[in-house]
Amino acid sequence: MNIMKILIIIGLLFFAFYNPQDPEDKTSVEEKKEVAVQPEPKPVPARKRFFTTRNVPAVNNFDTKDAYGQIISRCRTPQLDNQRMTNAHESTHFIHSQLRNDDVLSRRVKTFPGAFYIFPDKSFHIEQPKFLRKEIERYIPASLRFSRFNTYFGRNKSWAEYPLYIIDEFVAYINGSIVALDDHKNGQRVDSLDPMVGPIEFAVYSVATCMAIKDLDPEYWNNQEFQDFMYDTMKKSESIFKAGRNIYPYKNQEEILTNLKTSPDAENIRAFMKEHFDSFFLSID
């Protein structure tokens, strides 16, 4: 009888302490659930950028076989008495003027509009922000005020009520540089010493314009089409600069690039470019 009791007690103790898990496996069921491999999250697709454009048809019989001809053919009163790059730049301004005038005459807008010719055959139209052009200056650090600064800022009071005047110039410099690159490819002489300075210098001034818009007219900045137009224009400017930088080397363009990437007083410009313009220019070696 005593032996039977002893066997029963031994059996109960065996089942009380028996663990069928691997003796080396100390992980609880709950912990195993936590360390289970999770599926990789699906990447969020990039937002498709979009801004409304209009067609800009040819208005004369100028030969459109090259970039120069594409621009000149869309201008009712083109400039033709200077070097081709300068003619393209100035004729871009004239195209902008005819686009604005057409908007006013057709009563598409209530105030003086901004209108920008996008090479080779499109345009983007938008009204002006609600502040004076001089407000942009404080967003341009001293290290990034180069040769064209005094021409378009400082004592220059023309177009004072139109901040997008800076973008007007930016687009004109881009188009002039497009012609310089195309002419080089086609064996056409290019007389300018600095065809690539305009795109990078005015990229800086245009970023400053966007910074001013964001601070001084946030409702305007929240117009996604304007942001997308500026993104597209900045991207084009960087592409042109990279393509022509070594073809047309010039000291100022390298100083602008270096200061943009490294100067302490340009930190706000860099931060804005990283946030809104995919760090264009900042990753160029």
What do the PLM-derived regions correspond to, one by one?
Residues I71-T86:
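Short pre-active-site segment immediately N-terminal to the catalytic Zn-binding motif
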Residues I174-D285:
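Pan-zinc metallopeptidase signature
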Residues P20-P45:
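Sec-dependent signal peptide cleavage junction
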Residues Q98-R145:
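Post-HEXXH active-site segment of zinc metalloproteases
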Residues M85-N101:
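Active-site recognition of the HExxH zinc-binding catalytic motif
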Residues A142-K185:
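Extracellular-facing segments of soluble proteins and assemblies that are Gly/Ser/Thr-biased and enriched
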Residues M1-Q21:
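Sec-dependent N-terminal signal peptides
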Residues V37-D66:
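Non-catalytic accessory regions used for complex assembly or targeting
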